Regions:
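N-terminal signal peptide c-region/cleavage motif recognized by signal peptidases
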Residues: 10-14
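Cleavable N-terminal signal peptides
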Residues: 3-5, 15
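Small beta-barrel nucleic-acid-binding modules, primarily SNase/OB-fold domains
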Residues: 15-272
Length: 272
């Protein structure tokens, strides 16, 4: 038994471990991480490491007691006021909810393909000790929108189902005028900050070496990396259709664009 305990503590807690058990001719049980003849496989679930949350920066970023920042995967919450940042509608509500839920509490992190973002923050789905999925709860309550960054695709289906329900019930951000859909031809008339929803008809598609552009007009296009095109339906199938695009509006010279990383950012609007 002591050998089994030693083996369990020797195995990384983040990896599913296989331990083998067999009996010798005297009936004594033995355990190893290597398979022996006639050995039985024991499937040992990994243990979990929990971290204390020291600070909540906003609705989707926290600081652990070990000094590491964590950006919650698969979601986006509105900004709160800070250095070089203007407060956005719903940002403080998301932050307060997360503070109440997590500050000075213990959490478990579940990572995806990419471990860190370009700012050095850990990327993770965050779970409480009683197994509540915080990323998902933020979406369920309308405090966050879904924001998928391939190749990090864990829980995509669950997040999108929760978002659809929150939108249908007009919870949180889905009831703010700031996040109601704007017509594509209105974009040049005003400056819209933060995450937005834009509606328009795709008139054509243009390809460059690195990107494809689904164009609402000569001055506004949806920008998709060509290397990510296998995640989408045939891009040509969008031409002529009315879409709602979700993301951040960028301006370069006299042209506007929205970077589309995942097909969940595009909603086909059925014409009746």
């Amino acid at each position: 038994m002591l050998c089994l305990i030693f083996l369990l503590f020797s195995v990384s807690f983040s990896v599913q471990a296989e331990i083998y058990q067999w009996s010798d001719t005297k009936g004594n049980k033995h355990f190893s991480d290597r398979p022996y003849q006639d050995a039985q496989t024991l499937h040992i679930s990994p243990g979990y490491t929990y971290h204390y949350v020291k600070k909540v920066y906003d609705g989707d970023t926290i600081l652990l007691a070990n000094g590491k920042k964590v950006r919650l995967l698969g979601i986006n919450t509105p900004e709160v006021e800070g250095r070089n940042k203007t407060a956005q509608a719903g940002g403080e509500q998301a932050k307060r909810w997360l503070q109440k839920k997590l500050q000075n509490k213990k959490v478990r992190l579940l990572k995806d393909v990419e471990k860190n973002d370009k700012y050095g923050r850990l990327l993770a789905h965050v779970f409480t000790e009683d197994k509540q999925h915080i990323n998902l709860e933020l979406v369920e309550k309308g405090l966050a929108s879904v924001n998928i960054h391939p190749p990090n695709l864990k829980y995509t289906d669950q997040l999108l189902k929760a978002e659809l329900l929150a939108e249908q019930q007009r919870l949180g951000i889905w009831n703010y005028k700031e996040y109601q859909p704007k017509q594509a031809n209105q974009i040049k008339q005003a400056r819209f900050q933060g995450w937005q929803r834009v509606i328009g008809q795709i008139i054509n598609i243009r390809h460059s070496r690195k990107y494809s552009y689904l164009n609402f007009s000569d001055t506004f296009g949806l920008k998709i990396e060509r290397r990510s095109s296998d995640l989408f339906p045939e891009l040509e199938s969008y031409v002529g259709k009315k879409l709602e695009a979700r993301g951040w509006i960028n301006k370069h010279k006299n042209r506007y664009s929205m970077f589309i990383r995942h097909p969940s950012q595009l909603k086909v609007i059925n014409s009746r």
